[in-house]
């Protein structure tokens, strides 16, 4: 049993507690929360200078792309970034697995306890079986030709079932509105079952996506036409959010939202990956339109980020928004847990096992702050 205290305890369930104390058992479960350290004999308390918050939730990652780290120092837009991703198979399996392991170790060190991870392969399977982190595996499906929709869903089902057969959470999800035909979207909806809590979809990452659906023209349309894509992709959709009706789903996490505006917003969760946004498009979302109650944060992959650190992502959001410190921590912890359906994470509450992070050096901003995993 441990009694852990700090200058401030950010429960993210109630107001911050000055000199609050967490009572935690050997399994990391919160047994009690004390509002004042005087309630506990001082010799039993581990006191830290700084603030304590729950473990971070990385709501969007591509762990299987970790081997593409430092492939390029910069790219000029989304199309150039896709060229990097296309090289993913030019590496040995051993090299890929080592990079995946190193990336997970980095996330653990940086206080991340759970991840929404995009999967196109089973490269991460062996690592995830060890359950050092809690993963929601989104089996990504995409196909722009109607006649290949059944082939695409069959491949996704094979991968999903491998994860599920190893007791790992897995849901087939569309990559994006522009890369999935209406036929494939219908098939994805049809294979969804009661264990699928949410979908995760790349959304409005570039302005060209908006032009495609609104004006039925632009670089995306030209590219799609050049590869003989089904015109139903843009003709049948008035916006990226048209997929909500096609999926007939309960929940969606829309990822990136770099070119999302206030009128676009639906009652869903939105995940921002600011470091990756700057790397790929050199642009950030307009954070003023997003409520701090349904915005979560991800690192994206090491192909588009120098590190997997939620505190660094939050610092960048802080520099470009008016969110308070408590709101930023909710974005980094509570909201991601809610978006992914991870009920044991995200807040300090009795009965939960959320992990405990110590944050120091945050007096003026998160830019110079550091995180240390305590539990």
State the predicted function of each range.
Residues 2-3, 8-53, 172:
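Histidine-rich, glycine-flanked metal-binding segment
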Residues 23, 51-52, 69-132, 154-165:
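Alpha-helical scaffold segments that flank or form the walls of functional sites
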Residues 55-59, 115-116, 135-139, 170-174, ...:
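Hydrophobic faces of well-ordered beta-strands that scaffold small-molecule active sites
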Residues 62, 120, 140-144, 175-177, ...:
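Active-site beta-loop-alpha junctions enriched in small/polar residues
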Residues 66-98, 136-142, 206-251:
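Active-site gating loops and adjacent loop-to-helix segments of metal-dependent hydrolytic enzymes
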Residues 116, 173-189, 278-281:
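Active-site glycine- and acidic-residue-rich loops that bind
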Residues 222, 246, 274, 285-361:
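His/Asp/Glu-enriched, well-ordered alpha-helical/loop segment
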């Amino acid at each position: 049993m441990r009694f852990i205290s700090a200058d401030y305890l950010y429960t993210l369930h109630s107001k911050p507690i000055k000199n609050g104390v967490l009572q935690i058992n050997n399994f990391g479960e919160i047994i009690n929360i004390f509002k004042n350290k005087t309630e506990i004999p001082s010799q039993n308390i581990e006191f830290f200078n700084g603030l304590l918050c729950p473990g971070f939730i990385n709501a969007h990652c591509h762990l299987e792309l970790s081997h593409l780290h430092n492939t390029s120092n910069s790219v000029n837009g989304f199309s150039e970034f896709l060229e990097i991703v296309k090289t993913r198979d030019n590496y040995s399996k051993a090299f890929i697995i080592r990079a995946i392991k190193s990336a997970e170790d980095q996330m653990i060190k940086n206080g991340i306890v759970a991840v929404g991870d995009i999967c196109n392969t089973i490269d991460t399977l062996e690592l995830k079986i060890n359950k050092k982190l809690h993963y929601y595996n989104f089996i990504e499906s995409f196909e722009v030709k109607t006649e290949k929709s059944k082939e695409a869903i069959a491949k996704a089902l094979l991968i999903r079932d491998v994860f599920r057969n190893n007791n790992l959470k897995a849901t087939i999800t569309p990559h994006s509105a522009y890369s999935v035909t209406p036929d494939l979207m219908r098939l994805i909806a049809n294979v969804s079952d009661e264990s699928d809590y949410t979908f995760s979809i790349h959304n409005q990452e570039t302005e060209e996506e908006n032009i495609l659906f609104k004006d039925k023209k632009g670089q995306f349309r030209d590219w799609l036409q050049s590869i003989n894509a089904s015109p139903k992709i843009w003709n049948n959709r008035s916006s990226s959010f048209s997929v909500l009706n096609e999926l007939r789903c309960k929940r969606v996490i829309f990822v990136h939202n770099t070119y999302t505006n206030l009128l676009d917003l639906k009652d869903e969760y939105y995940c921002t990956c600011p470091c990756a946004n700057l790397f790929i498009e050199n642009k950030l979302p307009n954070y003023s339109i997003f409520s701090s109650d349904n915005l979560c944060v991800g690192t994206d992959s090491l192909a588009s980020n120098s590190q997997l650190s939620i505190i660094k992502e939050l610092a960048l959001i802080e520099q470009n928004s008016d969110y308070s410190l408590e709101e930023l921590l909710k974005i980094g912890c509570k909201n991601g847990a809610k978006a992914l359906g991870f009920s044991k994470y995200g807040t300090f509450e009795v009965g939960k096992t959320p992990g405990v992070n110590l944050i120091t050096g945050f007096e003026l901003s998160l830019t110079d702050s550091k995180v240390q995993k305590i539990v």
